[in-house]
Amino acid sequence: MLIIFLFFNFCYGFNEPLNVVSHLNHDWFLFGDSRSDCNHINNLKIKNYGYLDIHPSLCNNGKISSSAGDSIFKSYHFTRFYNYTGEGDQIIFYEGVNFNPHHRFKCFFNGSNDVWIFNKVRFYRALYSNMALFRYLTFVDILYNFSFSIKANICNSNILSLNNPIFISTNYSKDVYFTLSGCSLYLVPLCLFKSNFSQYYYNMDTGFAYGYSNFVSSDLDCTYISLKPGSYKIFSTGFVLSIPTKALCFNKSKQFVPVQVVDSRWNNLRASDTSLSDACQLPYCYFRNSSGNYVGKYDINHGDNGFTSILSGLLYNVSCISYYGSFLYDNFTSIWPRFSFGNCPTSAYIKLNCFYDPLPIILQGILLFLALLFIVFLLFLVYHG
């Protein structure tokens, strides 16, 4: 029987990498949207778990922070807000689709959604790289030494309103300070309009801004800075101060563990982007994707078989997670587990040219088994004299 096992192991391989997101133990957490929002099922006209891309048995395990219609990027920048909060050693992200080219957001009528897609890439790159080093994620408000009675109403559309950052005139009489305390690290936006000249008229009653800028960038260009706790002063050489109001809070440092990201996209009938794959880079991130179009069972954008298969890895532990996929065992594999963590295969097996008939192997196994029985019988006779 051992020969039969070795035959199939070496010639066919029992430990190929699986295209799933999974975990080594029960210390994991998932951040998602409607495709993993079990609470949203109760809001449907017909309570149908086919709406989800995760298995319903995961709904009450306390390891998922998801909200239909939301994303971490959207909650970070806009008034539409969900407080994504969770903790785990192995972090999985399956969200992001709720801000993409389909929404066509831009700050101005003649602005550019492309600038915002670049912002999205930079945001998720910073999020993923930081979460490889921390267990805990949540949102926090940034508090100031005074309230802003006058602020510019910039970057609004019929679907979203920007509230992080907000903008005030640099002629404001008070110095602007903020303090960060309570978290190990903060992700804070620094957004500006790249311009050589700007002039605005502020409505003192409504705070609405009318104006002109000689833009180099046609929209709001953001970078995302990881700041340690401390007191900060904001100053600018421009005409407008960009004031951050929210930050991502990272807490409870851990040994480096790459995050796992599942592509978040629509059916091909809607425009999607490649922001998540662009942001998810080695060594801090593993990217998982389905090879086909997203075609849901509940509707075309919910319940796709390919992505359900990828998320099915959350139902069980694996031995090893790597760039190529997850491994169930730590023995042999045909694909070396590059950039891996966990108990991973120690060597790649040599794939032999196994073209011979397996029947002789089976007969050898039977003969080996009979030989073992005969030896046991002889030992029995010797023992009983």
From Swiss-Prot:
It catalyses: N-acetyl-9-O-acetylneuraminate + H2O = N-acetylneuraminate + acetate + H(+); N-acetyl-4-O-acetylneuraminate + H2O = N-acetylneuraminate + acetate + H(+). The keyword Transmembrane helix applies. Its EC number is 3.1.1.53. Glycans are attached at N83, N110, N145, N171, N196, N251, N289, N331. Keywords: Disulfide bond, Glycoprotein, Hemagglutinin, Host cell membrane, Host membrane, Hydrolase, Membrane, Signal, Transmembrane, Transmembrane helix, Viral envelope protein, Virion. Disulfide bonds join C38-C59, C107-C155, C183-C249, C191-C222, C280-C285, C320-C344. The keyword Transmembrane applies. It is found in: Virion membrane; Host cell membrane. GO terms for molecular function: host cell surface receptor binding; sialate 4-O-acetylesterase activity; sialate 9-O-acetylesterase activity; sialate O-acetylesterase activity. Pfam families: Hema_esterase, Hema_HEFG. N-glycosylated in the host RER. The chain crosses the membrane at residues 362-382. Residues 12-361 are virion surface. The active site is at S34, D299, H302. It is a single-pass type I membrane protein. Residues 240-352 are annotated as: Esterase domain 2. Residues 122-239 are annotated as: Receptor binding. GO terms for cellular component: host cell plasma membrane; membrane; viral envelope; virion membrane. Residues 383-385 are intravirion. Residues 1-121 are annotated as: Esterase domain 1. One of its GO terms (biological process) is fusion of virus membrane with host plasma membrane. Residues 1-11 form the signal peptide. Belongs to the influenza type C/coronaviruses hemagglutinin-esterase family. Isolate N2 belongs to genotype B. Structural protein that makes short spikes at the surface of the virus. Contains receptor binding and receptor-destroying activities. Mediates de-O-acetylation of N-acetyl-4-O-acetylneuraminic acid, which is probably the receptor determinant recognized by the virus on the surface of erythrocytes and susceptible cells. This receptor-destroying activity is important for virus release as it probably helps preventing self-aggregation and ensures the efficient spread of the progeny virus from cell to cell. This is Hemagglutinin-esterase.
